[in-house]
């Protein structure tokens, strides 16, 4: 069976060639955009992806701790602990992190979207956002299953608290909203507090940030 994450990672990446004083230099497109402090969070969230995103965030902080970072998100979600490592790093570093959903920000993707700097969380007009509670499956001894179930409930409460912090909604509202898969249009996501603005072009995004 083909691993969909391997298929995604093996997608052909365009190269960009630049003229420098030492001649031509080639970058893959993502490395070139990283020079502009742009990070792409595309595809399922897992340990491999989170380590790359965290490394990029820390690199950009070391390069310039006062200049903002832009994170473009198109993700169906994924492993909660992997996503939380990205979330914690976003809150830990000094630069402000602007987030923009392109396509979709679902599950853990929606949490990372709303974790951007207040006033700097954006959506393109045809994107969608989906929030829900964490899920998991376990097998083994009954006691171990009970332990894992209790841990999942603790994780659910912690995720709810993070949404409360960044959306301004009360805990009961968040818990109700995340009870099932809850798809939102950009307008609904803005009203709920997951994003700050819906942007159609770059000039509007720049105006919103200023």
UniProtKB/Swiss-Prot annotation:
Its EC number is 3.4.21.92. GO terms for biological process: protein quality control for misfolded or incompletely synthesized proteins. It is found in: Cytoplasm. One of its GO terms (molecular function) is ATPase binding. GO terms for cellular component: cytoplasm; endopeptidase Clp complex. InterPro entries: ClpP (IPR001907), ClpP/crotonase-like_dom_sf (IPR029045), ClpP/TepA (IPR023562), ClpP_His_AS (IPR033135), ClpP_Ser_AS (IPR018215). Keywords: Cytoplasm, Hydrolase, Protease, Serine protease. SUPFAM superfamilies: ClpP/crotonase. It catalyses: Hydrolysis of proteins to small peptides in the presence of ATP and magnesium. alpha-casein is the usual test substrate. In the absence of ATP, only oligopeptides shorter than five residues are hydrolyzed (such as succinyl-Leu-Tyr-|-NHMec, and Leu-Tyr-Leu-|-Tyr-Trp, in which cleavage of the -Tyr-|-Leu- and -Tyr-|-Trp bonds also occurs). CDD domains: S14_ClpP_2 (cd07017). It is an enzyme of class 3 (hydrolase). Gene3D superfamilies: 2-enoyl-CoA Hydratase, Chain A, domain 1. Belongs to the peptidase S14 family. Cleaves peptides in various proteins in a process that requires ATP hydrolysis. Has a chymotrypsin-like activity. Plays a major role in the degradation of misfolded proteins. This is ATP-dependent Clp protease proteolytic subunit. It comes from Ruegeria sp. (strain TM1040).
């Amino acid at each position: 069976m083909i691993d969909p994450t391997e298929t995604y990672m093996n997608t052909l990446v365009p190269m960009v060639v630049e003229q420098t004083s030492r001649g031509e230099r080639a970058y893959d497109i993502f490395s070139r955009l990283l020079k502009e402090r742009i990070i792409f969070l595309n595809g399922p969230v897992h340990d491999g992806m989170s380590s790359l995103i965290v490394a990029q965030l820390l690199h950009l902080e070391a390069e310039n701790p006062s200049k903002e970072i832009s994170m473009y998100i198109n993700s169906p979600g994924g492993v909660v602990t992997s996503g939380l490592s990205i979330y914690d790093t976003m809150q830990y570093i000094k630069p402000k992190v602007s987030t923009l959903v392109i396509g979709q920000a679902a599950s853990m993707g929606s949490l990372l979207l709303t974790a951007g700097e207040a006033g700097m969380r954006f959506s393109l007009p045809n994107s969608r956002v989906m929030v829900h509670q964490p899920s998991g499956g376990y097998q083994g001894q009954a006691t171990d299953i009970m332990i894992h179930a209790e841990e999942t409930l603790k994780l659910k409460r912690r995720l709810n608290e993070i949404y409360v912090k960044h959306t301004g909604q009360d805990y009961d509202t968040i818990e109700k909203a995340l009870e099932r898969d809850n798809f939102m249009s950009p307008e609904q996501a803005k009203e709920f507090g997951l994003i700050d603005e819906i942007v159609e072009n770059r000039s509007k995004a720049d105006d919103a940030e200023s």
